[in-house]
Amino acid sequence: MLLKSLALIASSSLAATFNIGDDLFADPQFTVQFHNRPLRQADVQNGLLPHRDPVYGHPLGYEMMQFNGTNHICGIPEVTTTKSSKSREEGELSPTEARDRALELMLPLLGDCLFYEQGFFSYRFCYGSGVVQYRRHGDNYFPRIYPPPQADDSPTFVLGSFEKDDTTNTVTSAGGIPFLAHRLRSGTHCPLTGANREIEVQFVCDKNVQHDHILWIKEKRTCNYVMQVGTPRLCKDMRFQPPPDESLPIMCYSVESEAPEFETIDGMFDGVAHVKEEQEAVSARAHQFVGSNVNKDKIDEIEVAWRFTKARALNYIGVWLGDCVNRQTLFKELGIATPSHDAPFIIQTRSMFVPAPINRHFEVRLMITRQQLLLSINDDDVTLEEKYAWWQEQGDMSNLEIQGLTMLDDAGIEDVLARATDEVMKQLNKEAKQSKKLAKKKEAASTKREEAKKQVEASVEEKAVDSAEDDGTDTVTSTQTFFRTQTLSTAEAESKQMPDKAEEDEDEDLIVTMYFEDGEFKIEGFEVADFEGVKSAMKDLADKEDDDDDYEDYGLSD
């Protein structure tokens, strides 16, 4: 059989599955656009409104709405959309064939583990084994260790295991997006429900990444979980790719008794036709920034900002639509859009796109050795300098979040890695103390060797003199020289056997944290303007580590 190696995760059951990402606005999809130009009450009453959308050509129906006491009229496209085109339907597989094809594509992941952090908990998902929840060691993220270490007193909860007779696999779709779902049972017993914990693991095609990654984990009800994994593997088969993401505009105008008169009906839609081009341009540019470890629910770019997750979108619809009188100020403050003159504002009711709530998590690892600073971000080998340059170019770092720390302003990377500074200094202090202790031990050992050598020499000389007196020959010099050479060789061998801890320490990597403040990279005790300065400062510290005064200068004294 094709998938014998997946015996533990194979099943013919095709039960219905739950998807927390279901979207009430998925079909049809709309964006709400507020035009800057108001309409005259007389034009609205006389029906001087276009009957078709000037960009898409769809018939329009109109509804009067009121926001904060201001009347608005909105043109709603009268269309019906299908979830899949005819060509897509022709290429669809049967449920069993789709499941087997999806399992085949995911086969290379078998035995690999993915990790995810949420709050105080960490999750480990090993394909073919199961999902485990535990509390990570330490109360903060720093220094970052991957995979997240487990606290000594943390219990381990198995949320679900791949068991041959207790695992079901299905391929289904929600919101037009097909995915492979594993229903894992046999988890740790839950005292609140009296049953074992269960989890549904959903694999969805994610074309924007190169590696498998956990998108989110939710507890949909007590001890019953859903986890979604984004993977490029399913994208190899177009039948598992999501349908094209298209939305139709709902254009709204404020209605006023006195408003400028348009020369033509089409004049009301000036500035609308170019919106699509702007969206595509910004989307293409933003895709250069998104990396494999971006922690995101379905993120896409539209016009000038990021979309909200779908669940959060619903909460914000009322906020924006309820404050349309001051919408220009509101949009600018929230960073949603800064439209040019006569261009429409855009609010998307399907997946909101303001940047603030999107968490962009990167695994940042800084290593300072005695001679070299190493820096990397586990994001397709893109360095922090390159990302920082990109954020600077955008002119807005106010809501960037790295490893749980929020950028506070545009001045620079503030508090990115500040929390690890204390740990670094403790480590350096510890190393300094160890170096001092080692030096004292070496000195004591050397003193003992010298004393032993003197005792041996004295004994040899005494015996040589006695021997010379007995036989009447002068053998003092040769005998003394022989024993002295032997004694020195033994001491030298003992010295070589003693490990030089100071030299070993110079080659060890120190996992450290830096932060950027007032235009300078800093570590506690250092204020340097660039990486070369950091390397120089660390090298100076290494060169002077045996000098108590120098340790005191760097804040490393006992």
Swiss-Prot record:
Record field: compositional bias (Polar residues): 474-492
Main location: endoplasmic reticulum
Record's GO cellular component terms: endoplasmic reticulum lumen; endoplasmic reticulum membrane
SUPFAM superfamilies: Mannose 6-phosphate receptor domain (SSF50911)
Glycosylation sites: N68
Location of this chain's protein in the cell: Endoplasmic reticulum membrane
GO biological process: endoplasmic reticulum unfolded protein response; retrograde protein transport, ER to cytosol
Disulfide bond annotation, renumbered to this chain: C113-C126, C190-C223, C205-C235
All residue ranges annotated as the MRH domain in the record: 111-237
Biased composition (Acidic residues): 543-558
Signal peptide bounds: 1-17
Residues that hold a mannooligosaccharide derivative according to the record: Q133, R197, E219, Y225
Keyword check for Signal: yes
Keyword Iron found: no
Name of protein: Protein OS-9 homolog
Species annotation: Yarrowia lipolytica (strain CLIB 122 / E 150) (Yeast)
Upper classification of the organism: Eukaryota, Fungi, Dikarya, Ascomycota, Saccharomycotina
